[in-house]
UniProtKB/Swiss-Prot annotation:
This is Golgin subfamily A member 5. Residues 134-146, 189-199 have a biased composition (Basic and acidic residues). GO terms for molecular function: protein homodimerization activity; small GTPase binding. Residues 93-222 are annotated as: Disordered. Its main location: Golgi. The gene is GOLGA5.
Amino acid sequence: MSWFVDLAGKAEDLLNRVDQGAATALSRKDNASNIYSKNTDYTELHQQNTDLIYQTGPKSTYISSAADNIRNQKATILAGTANVKVGSRTPVEASHPVENASVPRPSSHFVRRKKSEPDDELLFDFLNSSQKEPTGRVEIRKEKGKTPVFQSSQTSSVSSVNPSVTTIKTIEENSFGSQTHEAASNSDSSHEGQEESSKENVSSNAACPDHTPTPNDDGKSHELSNLRLENQLLRNEVQSLNQEMASLLQRSKETQEELNKARARVEKWNADHSKSDRMTRGLRAQVDDLTEAVAAKDSQLAVLKVRLQEADQLLSTRTEALEALQSEKSRIMQDQSEGNSLQNQALQTFQERLHEADATLKREQESYKQMQSEFAARLNKVEMERQNLAEAITLAERKYSDEKKRVDELQQQVKLYKLNLESSKQELIDYKQKATRILQSKEKLINSLKEGSGFEGLDSSTASSMELEELRHEKEMQREEIQKLMGQIHQLRSELQDMEAQQVNEAESAREQLQDLHDQIAGQKASKQELETELERLKQEFHYIEEDLYRTKNTLQSRIKDRDEEIQKLRNQLTNKTLSNSSQSELENRLHQLTETLIQKQTMLESLSTEKNSLVFQLERLEQQMNSASGSSSNGSSINMSGIDNGEGTRLRNVPVLFNDTETNLAGMYGKVRKAASSIDQFSIRLGIFLRRYPIARVFVIIYMALLHLWVMIVLLTYTPEMHHDQPYGK
C-alpha cells in the first residue's frame, strides 16, 4: 500500500502546484494592465517624445526595460502554465520563490474545467493571427516614412506587449475554466482595440514630424539601425514567445488531460483502495484464522514431535526387542523340534480332554433330559391327583352345603315347635289360673250357701253341685287336652333329639371328610416340598454343571488363545525362516489342520452355549410352573377351578413364558398381548442371566439406580414452582 500512498501524495502535490501557478498568473495580471494603459496613453507619449528624442541613453534603457518586462512576463507565463514538472522552472521563477510562496491559493476563483478540442483550435488560430498582424504593421510603418524612432519602437513594444497581454488573458481564462467562446470574443475585441491604437499611433507619429524639429541624419541612421535591430530582436522574441505559448498551451492541455486521467485514476485507485481495504480486512481475518490454525498446527506439531520422540523410543525398544528376538530365534529354531513334539502331545491330551468333556456333557444332557422327563411325568401325575382332589373337594363342598341347608331348615322347624310349645304352656298356665279362680269362686259360693238355711239351701246346693259337676267335667277335658299336648311335646322333643343326633352324625362325617381332605392336602404339600427340594438339588447340580461348563469354556478359550499365539509365533517363525519346500508344506498342512480343529472347537462351543441357554430357559420355565403349582395348591378349599374344564390346570397371568404354543397362536388382541408378554419375559430372563453372570454390570446398575433416585429426591426437594401473579383469562 506504500506505492498507493506515494501516488496519492504526488497527485496532491501536482494539484497544489497547478493552484500556485494560477495564483502567480493572477498576481501578474495587474502589471500587464498597467503596461497596456501606458501604451494607450497617447498624449503622454507625445509629450515624452519631445523630451526624449535626443536622449539615446535613456531611450535604450527604456527599450531594455521593456524587453526585460517582456521576459518577466514570459517567465511568469511559463511559471503559471508549466508548473507541473519540477525540473521545468525558469531562473526568473527561481529568483522569486518568496513571491510565489507568499501568494495565497485562490481556491474560490480557481475552477478546473475540461475544454473541448474545437475551442482549443480556435484559440490557437486566434493566437497565430494576433502574432502576425502586429509585426506586419510595424514593418509597414517602418517602411513608410522614417518616423521618429522612439514612437515606432514604442508602438512596436506596445504591439508586442499587447499579444502577450491577450495571451496572458487567454491563459488566465483557460486556467480558470471560463467558456471558450467568451474568451475568443474578448480576444477579438482586444485585438481590434490594439489595431486601432496602433493605427492612431502611426497617424500621430505621421503627424508629429510637422511639430518636432528634424535631427541630424547620422543620429537618425544610428537610431534607425538600433531600432531595426531592436525590432528584429523583438520579432524573434515574439515568435519564440508565440512558440513557447503554443507549446505551453499544448502542455497545459496535456496536463489537463493528464489531470483528468489522474483524477479518474485516483477515483479508480480509491475504489481499488476500498476494495483492497475490504480484501485486506478479509485477508487479515484469514491471516488471524491462519495464525490460529498455525498455532493449532504448532501445538499438533509439538504433540507429533512428542509422539515422534515416543515413536523413536519405541523404535529403539523395538529394535532392541528385535535384536533380542533374533538372538532368541536361533534358540527357538533349536527348540522347534522339541516344541513340535510337545505340541503334538499337548494337542493329543487336549483332544482327549475335549472328548472326555464332550462325553461328560452328553451324559449330563441325557441325565438332565431323563430327569426332565421324570419330572414332567411327576408333574402330570401331581396335576391329575390335584384335579381329582379338586373334584372331590367340590363334591364334598356341595354335600356340605346341602346338609347345611337341611340343618338350617330343621333348626327353623325346631324353633317353630318350641314357640308353639311355649304358647301352649302359656295357655295351659292361663287356663289353670282361670280354673283355680273359678273353683275358688265356686267354693266361696258353696260355703255361703251352706251357711244359708232351709230349702232354698238345698236348691242352691243342687245347683252348685251341678255346676261343680260341670266344672269337673271341664277339668277332665282340660286334663285330656293337656295330656295330648304333653304327648305332642314329648314327640317333638324326641324328633328334635333325633334330628340333633343326625346333624351331629352328619357334622362328624363332614369333619371326617374335611380331615381326610386336609390330610390329602398335607400329603400333597409334603410331596410338593419333596419336589421343591429335588428341584433345588437339580438347580444346584445344574448350576454346578453350568459353572463347570463355564470354567471348561474359559479354559478352552484360554488354551485356544495360547494355541493361537503359538500358531502366530509359528507363522512369524515360518515367515522369518527360509526352510525347504517340503518343510513349509508340512507346516502349512499342520497349520490348516490346527485351524480346522480350532474352527470345529469354536462351533462346538457355540452349540454348547446355545444348548446351555436353552436348558436355562427350560429350567426357569419349570421353576415358574412349580411356583404356579405351589400358588394354586396353597389356596386350600377356595381353589379357582376355572381351568379344570380345559384340562390345562391353573395358569398365572403374570408368567407369560408358561403359555403354550396353542395359547400364543390365538388370533386377535389376546394372542398379541400374550406374545408381547412372553417376549418381555424372555428379555427379562436374558437380562437376569446377564446380570447374574457379570457382577460388574450389576454394580453399575445399582450405582445408576442409586444416583437416579438421589437426583430425583434432590429435584423433588429443591424444586420450587413458579408463582404467576397474573390475572386469570390471560389478562
